[in-house]
Amino acid sequence: MIIHSLLDTDLYKFTMMQAVLHQHPAAQVDYRFKCRTPGVDLAQFIDEISREIDALCRLRLREDEVDYLRSLRFIKPDFADFLALFHLDRKYLSLTASATHPGEIELTIRGPWLHTILFEVPLLAIINEVWFRNTSEPDFEEGRSRLREKVASLRSMPAGCKIADYGTRRRYSRQWHGELLPLLRDGLGEQFVGTSNVYFAKQYGLTPLGTMAHEYLQAFQALGPRLRDSQVAALESWAREYRGDLGIALSDVVGLDAFLRDFDLYFCKLFDGMRHDSGDPFEWGERVIAHLEAHRVDPRTKVLVFSDGLNIDKVMRLYQHFHTRCRLAFGVGTSLTNDLGPTPLQIVIKMVRCNGQPVAKLSDSPGKSMCEDIGYLRYLRDVFGLPPMAET
């Protein structure tokens, strides 16, 4: 069994789930899986993946796990009580081999947002681990050697250059993930600030990290009063739920231009910072700092979180570029948890509908956008004043 606990996921799934429970418990959503890596035959392992999903759906949180969640300052008692009764239901998930693209799988999730939000991360971890254990021989000593080199590189930097683990969804295996975290903790000391993985945070006494993901802002394209106001509605909803806690806003759901137009003086003061997850990180940082300064907010009081495809070299370059001008945080994923030699898979599960309406992410990186409805993508770009889509 690959997933042993419902805590083996990213913290932001729980923080979003709590907001959904309190504000949108009746919302219905659709998610869809996509493998961006060409030539990957996942269909041959569909039965194995399906058995792992069955095992996942039998899991419930243990009393000590619920108590751990209760101990987090932002988890409210009613949500912890709800989680004590919660389990993932297989009826909301469909897994078949693609009839039109040999070797590909069709994985969709459809049901109440509240009851499906926890599927994404463990499903991606399952697919990854099934793939790698059937197609590669792990070289853990090579992985340890590479990890030691990364630790040494970071140790050569000033103490303020710190990283966190964001690598659950694309890890090589649960066992390797569990091995590398104490190595990072012991090797980096205060330069390792925590992990997005709640299970391992509990196990190793690390700080669990995370706020919101793209799906939260995407959903408000259907839940909000007007499409043009969807980002504002999502951020205000978050502020109502957490009252200043968990104050990192995600900036690339409809692109940075549209985000900065919505992120006015009120949000600049209210939120602790912003997270970068697509596009050029140096350009993004410069624009965010300029935006804060234009609103008379000192960037040195705000956090810029970088989490898009980071490796240690990029972390060090970003730190050297920005560290005197703002506070910094770095979430490193695949480069930590899946650097054993085999090529990592580029796999995602994205929300594509909410309450029957299409929703979309207009990423700042080509190829990261995902939507089933081209007409809606054109409309979304028009509403937010973005350039028209290139015709193909």
From Swiss-Prot:
Pathway where it operates: Cofactor biosynthesis; NAD(+) biosynthesis; nicotinate D-ribonucleotide from nicotinate: step 1/1
Gene Ontology MF annotations: nicotinate phosphoribosyltransferase activity
Protein name: Nicotinate phosphoribosyltransferase
CDD domains noted in UniProt: PncB_like (cd01401)
HAMAP family reported for this sequence: NAPRTase
Cellular component aspect of the GO annotation: cytosol
NCBIfam families listed in its UniProt record: NAPRTase (TIGR01514), PRK05321.1 (NF003704)
PTM-bearing positions, type Phosphohistidine: H214
Gene Ontology terms: biological process: NAD biosynthetic process via the salvage pathway
Catalyzed reactions per annotation: nicotinate + 5-phospho-alpha-D-ribose 1-diphosphate + ATP + H2O = nicotinate beta-D-ribonucleotide + ADP + phosphate + diphosphate
EC number(s) given by UniProt: 6.3.4.21
InterPro entries xrefs: N/Namide_PRibTrfase (IPR041525), NAPRTase_N (IPR040727), Nic_PRibTrfase (IPR006406), Nic_PRibTrfase-Fam (IPR007229), Nicotinate_pribotase-like_C (IPR036068)
Keyword tags: Ligase, Phosphoprotein, Pyridine nucleotide biosynthesis
Free-text function comment from the UniProt entry: Catalyzes the synthesis of beta-nicotinate D-ribonucleotide from nicotinate and 5-phospho-D-ribose 1-phosphate at the expense of ATP.
Protein family according to the UniProt entry: Belongs to the NAPRTase family.
Posttranslational mods: Transiently phosphorylated on a His residue during the reaction cycle. Phosphorylation strongly increases the affinity for substrates and increases the rate of nicotinate D-ribonucleotide production. Dephosphorylation regenerates the low-affinity form of the enzyme, leading to product release.
Keyword Phosphoprotein found: yes
